[in-house]
Each structure stands twice: as C-alpha cells, then as structure tokens.
C-alpha cells in the first residue's frame, strides 16, 4: 500500500535490497531499503533519490532519507544528517504520512544540490586528498585498535576505478573513497598478516551509517575550503 501510494504521487522504485537474516521466522519481516526517484530526477550523471527504510516486524517504523545515485559506477550515496530525515511510526495513516515524508525529503534536494555543486567546485591537493582518505578509513576501521589496524591504505581508497574518476575535485575524491570503502575488493593484510581482500558492505544499517558519515566528512571539508 505504501509503495502504491508513492507510485501514485510520481515516485518510482529503482532499487530494493533487504537485510540477510538467519532465523527463518524473521525472513519475511526483515528490513528493506528502497531507492526511489521522482519523475524530475530520472536522468543525469547523478540523480537525487528518496531512500525508504522499513522493518516489517514492528521493531522500527519507516525512515526516509535523501540520497544521490551515480550511474557511472552504480554507486548509491546517502546525504548527511543536516539534510531532512523523516521517521514515520507504524501507526495512524501510515501511507499518507510516508507520502508526506517523501515530499519533505524532496524539499531538501536543493540543499543536496548545493552541497554537491560546492564539492565539485573545490580542488584538493595531494595532502588534502590523503587527509580525507585517512579520516574515511577511521570511519570504517577503529584507529584506536592497535592490534587490528586498517587492512588497506589511504592510497588504495583514492585509487580510481575508471578514467573519469581521476579528477581532483572534492566530489570525485569523495566518490572514489566511498566506492572503494563500500564495494570492497581491495587487497590488504589481515590482523595476522595474511593476504586478504576487503569485503563489500552489505548490511543496510552499516551501509547507511557509513555513507552518511562520509557525506558529512566531505561537506565539512567543503566548508573548510570555501
């Protein structure tokens, strides 16, 4: 009913994923993440999205967030906490409340564009790029855990996966770092010193938390450089 109501208001789902659960009786009630786009945000190099999170077991209500999807790398980002987040409990007129929440997130798209354009206008030198990557590593791996240092380096996070990502603007550096952190596949060393490959982040909560933190890190650097 919620999806039907959102579709009727012009929001189209483009990606759905769900949390893996071991308990069979929880499987149909697991948390879902749905990335939706209004008709005005269908085309472009990157598009703004409304992200809908829901857990059907009643443990949490609906959560709506703003996000950006970048087509060239099929990368989905989540905007920082300064951009509207709407929570809708599983009570009352749920469908209408979720629709209202989606339009509230839509109102925040101008701020997303402003921050995104600001990042594209900022150029980072080599030291600044490494400082950004170092801070990003600390979001993913606990820097205080001396027994389990980060298995990869700043230079690995900054390595572009495609030619067009070799630019030095903050937005592109942010994209490279985010993609390498979340998609995994980087060769490194485990705690015991054995060769390993980093795993992609598949958990919904962990993915959203890291993505929001990375956005806030990038926006903080944008403000420092402005």
Where do the model's predicted regions map?
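Amphipathic alpha-helical segments
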Residues: 1-17
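Intrinsically disordered, low-complexity regions enriched in serine/threonine
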Residues: 20, 39-226
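Accessory recognition modules or surfaces
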Residues: 17-41
């Amino acid at each position: 009913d919620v999806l039907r109501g959102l579709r009727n208001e012009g929001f189209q789902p483009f990606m759905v994923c769900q949390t893996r659960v071991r308990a069979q009786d929880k499987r149909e009630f697991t948390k879902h993440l749905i990335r939706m786009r209004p008709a005005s945000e269908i085309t472009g190099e990157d598009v703004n999205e409304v992200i809908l999170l829901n857990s059907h077991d009643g443990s949490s209500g609906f959560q709506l967030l703003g996000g950006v999807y970048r087509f060239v790398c099929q990368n989905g980002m989540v905007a920082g906490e300064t951009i509207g987040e709407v929570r809708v409990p599983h009570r009352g007129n749920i469908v209408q409340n979720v629709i209202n929440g989606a339009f509230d997130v839509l109102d925040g798209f101008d701020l997303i564009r402003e921050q995104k354009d600001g990042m594209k206008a900022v150029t980072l030198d080599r030291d600044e790029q490494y400082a950004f990557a170092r801070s990003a590593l600390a979001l993913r791996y606990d820097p205080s855990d001396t027994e389990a240092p980060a298995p990869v380096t700043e230079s690995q996070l900054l390595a572009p996966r495609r030619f067009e990502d070799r630019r030095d603007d903050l937005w592109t550096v942010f994209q490279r770092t985010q993609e390498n952190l979340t998609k995994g596949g980087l060769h490194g060393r485990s705690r015991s010193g054995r060769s390993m490959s980093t795993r992609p982040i598949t958990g919904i909560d962990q993915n959203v938390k890291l993505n929001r933190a990375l956005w806030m890190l990038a926006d903080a650097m944008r403000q420092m450089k402005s």
